[in-house]
A protein has these predicted regions:
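Loop-helix junctions at membrane interfaces
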Residues: 1-282
């Protein structure tokens, strides 16, 4: 039985990894060179259904394969994807199960998370305003990025207007999730909280790893911070789309597959059994 479950899990990881890679091909290009895609969304659904380690493998293998195909000459990009996507997928699956098992107050934490995104909005807006007088622009238009002074060097940036716009959308979404959480099922609240935390980690991780790996392997650190900042809008928009789709797609998918032995999950199954017993005793 155990060997069968492991075999089923390997097959499902392979299928979801292929879908994740395919989802990364569904993309909208951003002016700064990055793109919005559906790879993260597939990884999140896999993590919610299969668990943290499996979800991490799906993201790492699926989006890592895409990078191997198109960025084989950029080791920093491939390494960043393999590391970060595993971490993000693991966080989604682990937090989701922890929230359900421990009956965490998701509404309270959604308010707290909304506050964190509010800080991100404020900081990014300050950068945008302060950078408006910079005299050298790297990309132009609505997604313009400008040089400025950081650490005493001429490497300042005017953050894209996309960053504060989508940061405030994240803030509103998190707070609205807390306010209207009574309309969501317990699972939907758990999905919303776990995915928002993971996306926050993904945005921060994308910036830090791009800055460090690009600085170590490709260019200097001053140039790499400009490159890392220019990619933030794509990460934010992709994350926002992933959150919205995950909240509304997971529940019907879960109901369709929850009785299948291939998707058996000890923690979730035992939690549901305990809830049924509590209802019977009442």
């Amino acid at each position: 039985m155990k060997k069968t479950n492991i075999f089923n899990k390997v097959i499902l990881i392979s299928i979801f990894a292929a879908l994740c890679c395919a989802g990364t091909f569904v993309q909208i290009r951003m002016p700064a060179g990055d793109f919005v895609h559906l790879g993260n969304f597939v990884m999140i659904v896999a993590a919610l259904l299969l668990g943290g380690i499996s979800g991490g493998l799906v993201g790492s293998l699926g989006m890592g394969l895409y990078d191997l195909i198109f960025y084989f000459d950029k080791p920093s990009t491939i390494l960043r994807t393999f590391i970060l996507k595993f971490i993000v997928g693991f966080i989604v699956g682990f937090l989701f199960r922890l929230i359900i098992k421990k009956k965490v107050n998701a509404s309270l934490w959604l308010y707290i998370l909304g506050g964190l995104f509010g800080v991100l909005f404020t900081v990014s807006l300050i950068f945008f305003i302060l950078g408006s007088k910079a005299d050298f622009n790297i990309t132009s238009g609505f997604n313009s990025i400008y040089k400025a002074h950081i650490f005493g060097k001429t490497t300042n940036i005017k953050i894209s207007l996309y960053v504060p716009i989508f940061s405030i959308l994240f803030t509103a979404f998190a707070i609205a999730g807390g306010i209207f959480s009574y309309r969501l099922t317990e699972r939907q609240r758990a999905v919303l909280l776990s995915v928002m935390v993971a996306i926050f980690v993904n945005i921060l991780g994308e910036f830090i790893l791009r800055w460090i790996l690009e600085g170590l392997l490709v260019s200097d650190f001053r140039t790499s911070i400009v490159v890392a900042t220019s990619k933030i809008p794509g990460s934010i928009i992709t994350g926002f789309i992933s959150i919205v789709l995950s909240v509304f797609v997971y529940e019907p998918v879960y109901r369709a597959v929850k009785d299948s032995p291939a998707f058996y999950d000890d923690i979730v199954y035992e939690t549901e059994s305990n809830q049924k017993e509590e209802l019977l005793h009442e």
